[in-house]
């Protein structure tokens, strides 16, 4: 009996060695034909943690779970008209440029306001802009920019405005069933691999439409077919809620609106989280406003009555004064922002220390430059 078991083990071992050798030969042939890295074991990947770029909003970074938009993935931002979709995308553009990257904006709607983009922190002199004549042209331009590997972020505004060339050449009233959906499906198949390979973030802004004859369930849908829904790693539903009234002389006028951004799909973190932000007209997302709210909830900023304080020092009476104080003291803003990110697990302790060191060096350099400037003036 023992001899029989031993013989079976030897046969199994021999068979296993032959299979392993056959696999190694197959892997060598694949690498020879398609290049190194065409097939690999999952544990051998150098970067197992998903790389992200901040969205430009602390609340949205927290809702996304990973700390921002995942690199090498497709993002869809959709919602009703004037809900803040383009504003959210422009904050991503400003953040990409802030981190030293190159951003491109495919303006299919031909409606981008350069002054508003600049107000949100976008360097319009460095932003690559295209206003294509057709949907195919816009997607082809986006594809060439992504294939170059030099662009960090591409924004397409919007999918609904990517009109197929056949529809443009035809007459109004002609039926073009499924043309846009086929165009988007082909584009997704073509672009997805290149986006992942070059680690480019591709943001597609989309509109809403109503399904005809829906009696039960949500009648809302997005144009462009289903391909984008499948290929997108993150889908954001942006909706404005209540108007923000001004104070003093502006108490009767609206100066912004509270907006909810729901993560309806997320392949890199748990979905269905909601970010509540304030979008101020002409300014974009109030970064100081969201920081005061989140830091107060975490007791990083202490609130006693109407007063807000940090580390025992009062920073303002009322949220507006606290926001103004943080806007005037960017080094304090960065310090509190880092503490919030560490609290939510978006940064490790070591990353916090290095970020604080960089911020300290920048502050010292700024002070030195100011001193030198004073000496030159004298």
UniProtKB/Swiss-Prot annotation:
GO biological process, one term: DNA repair
Keyword field contains Endoplasmic reticulum: no
Subcellular location: Cytoplasm
UniProt keyword annotations, A-Z: ATP-binding, Cytoplasm, DNA damage, DNA recombination, DNA repair, DNA-binding, Nucleotide-binding, SOS response
Matching CDD domains: RecA
SUPFAM superfamilies from the UniProt entry: P-loop containing nucleoside triphosphate hydrolases, RecA protein, C-terminal domain
SMART domains: AAA
Alphabetized Pfam families for the sequence: RecA, RecA_C
Alphabetical list of InterPro entries matching this protein: AAA+_ATPase, DNA_recomb/repair_RecA, DNA_recomb/repair_RecA_CS, P-loop_NTPase, RecA-like_C, RecA-like_N, RecA_ATP-bd, RecA_C_sf
Primary location class: cytoplasm
Gene Ontology terms: cellular component: cytosol
Function text: Can catalyze the hydrolysis of ATP in the presence of single-stranded DNA, the ATP-dependent uptake of single-stranded DNA by duplex DNA, and the ATP-dependent hybridization of homologous single-stranded DNAs. It interacts with LexA causing its activation and leading to its autocatalytic cleavage.
Classification via PANTHER family: MITOCHONDRIAL DNA REPAIR PROTEIN RECA HOMOLOG-RELATED, RECA
HAMAP family the UniProt entry points to: RecA (MF_00268)
Full protein name: Protein RecA
Organism in which the protein naturally occurs: Streptococcus pyogenes serotype M1
């Amino acid at each position: 009996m023992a001899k029989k078991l031993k013989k079976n083990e030897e046969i199994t071992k021999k068979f296993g060695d032959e299979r392993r050798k056959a696999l190694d030969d197959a892997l060598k042939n694949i690498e020879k034909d398609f290049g190194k890295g065409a097939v690999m074991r999952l544990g051998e990947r150098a970067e197992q943690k998903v790389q992200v770029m901040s969205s430009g909003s602390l609340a949205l970074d927290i809702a996304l779970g990973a700390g921002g938009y995942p690199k090498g993935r497709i993002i869809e931002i959709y919602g009703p008209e004037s809900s803040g979709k383009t504003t959210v995308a422009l904050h991503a553009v400003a953040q990409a440029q802030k981190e030293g990257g190159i951003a491109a904006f495919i303006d299919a709607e031909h409606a981008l306001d350069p002054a508003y983009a600049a107000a949100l922190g976008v360097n319009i002199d460095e932003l690559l802009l295209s206003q294509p004549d057709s949907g195919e042209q816009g997607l082809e331009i986006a594809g060439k920019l992504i294939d170059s590997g030099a662009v960090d972020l591409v924004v397409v505004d919007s999918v609904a405005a990517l009109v197929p060339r056949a529809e443009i050449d035809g007459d109004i009233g002609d039926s073009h069933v499924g043309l846009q959906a086929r165009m988007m499906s082909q584009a997704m198949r073509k672009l997805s691999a290149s986006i992942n390979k070059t680690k480019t973030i591709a943001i597609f802004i989309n509109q809403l439409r109503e399904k005809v004859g829906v009696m039960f369930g949500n009648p809302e849908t997005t144009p462009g077919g289903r391909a984008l829904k499948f290929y997108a790693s993150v889908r954001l539903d942006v909706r404005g809620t209540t108007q923000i009234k001004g104070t003093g002389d502006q108490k009767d006028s609206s100066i912004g609106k509270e907006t909810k951004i729901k993560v309806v799909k997320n392949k890199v973190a748990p979905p269905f989280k909601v970010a509540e932000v304030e979008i101020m007209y002409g300014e974009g997302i109030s970064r100081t406003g969201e920081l005061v709210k989140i830091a107060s909830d975490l007791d990083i900023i202490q609130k006693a009555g109407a007063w807000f304080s940090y580390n025992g020092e009062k920073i303002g009476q009322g949220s507006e004064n606290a926001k103004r104080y943080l806007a005037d003291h960017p080094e304090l803003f960065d310090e509190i922002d880092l503490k919030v990110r560490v609290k939510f697990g978006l940064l490790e302790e070591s990353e916090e220390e290095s970020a604080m060191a960089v911020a300290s060096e920048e502050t010292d350099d700024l002070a030195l430059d100011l001193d030198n400037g004073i000496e030159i003036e004298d």
